[in-house]
Amino acid sequence: VDRLPFELERPQNAGVNSIMLFGIPDHKDEVGSGAYDPNGIVQKALREAKKQFPDMYYITDVCMCEYTSHGHCGVLCGHDVNNDATLELLAKTAISHVEAGADMVAPSDMMDGRVRAIREALDANGHYGAPIMSYAVKYASAFYGPFRDAAGSAPSFGDRKSYQMDFHNRREGMKEALTDVEEGADIIMVKPAMSYLDMVSEVSKAVNVPVATYSVSGEYAMVKAAAKMGWIDEERIMCEMAVSAYRAGAQIYLTYYAKELAKCMDEGRIG
């Protein structure tokens, strides 16, 4: 939290007006209690950020994996995630984020029914206008590796394929997107971006809400590594990746290149 002024001043000066916050707590436990602690890392960061940079738009990741000692996205029952028990904790997390100053919450856990649970909980606590960006079309992808290493959120056993989608599957992605809109999602996200632009295109034609896509850590790392070796033009690749997402139908693009893209847009190198 003490680094917030430095970390937020740079994107704001670059012309970035929206950021997403992820939390890595000092202590993790079986039920991820740090996720919904009113004095948790994200909650503290939101309160401080709102004071120092009130014009920035703050979106928060709502999930348990960074907070659980086992690295899974919910409460365990044996070696399986208990979907319904997890919904209650996700709703508590979303409420705590909004009450700390979040402008939007983004559940990324992939539990069934979590958008409805969060929407009902927010409304019951008077947060009727708080929007939800749902990670509706989230695939079990190898592209997440660098983020999981940085956040220390890799599962200690098994994997997340029981609640994230098989990357072969198109129909399930469409079904999830439509279901989450019915449950109250204001924005639908497709994740990852680069290898799933077909889904960005299809979802954008099927839903009546904005579509976001997330260019994840593995995509960023590949470009960085290839650029370091002198094999590619990093800036041109970065711009092509962003434009391809918008061309496919995305209206929101989440990226680790936000500052650099903002500069390119400001200088008229991309539209």
List the model feature ranges, each with a label.
Residues V1-G271:
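Alpha/beta enzyme core
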